[in-house]
């Protein structure tokens, strides 16, 4: 959830996209429609935000962010968080996965 929030906030703070801090509501879903393990995050994001002067500004575009830009930012942050968690021991590698395989998945 942190990777999603930080990605949205950092990109939308850029005047090229919004230049403001948006409102964000996020929900973590851990299952898919077929009741299989499928963790994913849904985010509702306001179509505007609060600028540095404290004013609400509307989005300049029909979409807040280009898909590729958000995808790259989120993937980079998520892989970084996962790498740090594995390195620190906060996230344990599954027994049948080697450290090399885990590392290759995160790069």
Regions found by a protein language model. Give the residues of each.
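Beta->alpha loop/short-helix hinge microenvironment recognizer with preference
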Residues: 1-107
